Amino acid sequence: MEILGTKYELIKNDHGLIEANIDGECKTYAKVIRIRPLQDMLYGEATEDERKKRYSEVMRHEVIHAFFNESGLSDYSNNEELVDWLAMQFPKMLKVFQELGCTE
């Protein structure tokens, strides 16, 4: 995938992240985004829908890190609260933008 003209490798179903106890990561210098397997998202009694929602949220989260880094905004990329907020709110924002016809 390309993030602002820079190629990133996307590694889905990375079992190594389970051992590290993280759902995903964006390796800025290596230009790699890694995501843990869908079936290993969340713990306990999580439903398949909950796991899919978390998987998508983690994917957005890591891509946002990459966008901030490629924009020269590494301080924003290091702000997990901001990155989480954008990852969680983006689908809602996109829906409004689409309704308004302002996605171009």
Describe the function of each predicted region.
Residues Q89-V96:
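Short, basic alpha-helical nucleic acid-contact segments in DNA-binding proteins
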Residues M1-K53, A66-E70, S74-Q89:
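Active-site scaffold of zinc-dependent metalloenzymes
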Residues Q98-E104:
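Long, well-structured alpha-helical subdomains associated
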Residues R54-E62:
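Short alpha-helical catalytic segment bearing the HExxH-like zincin motif
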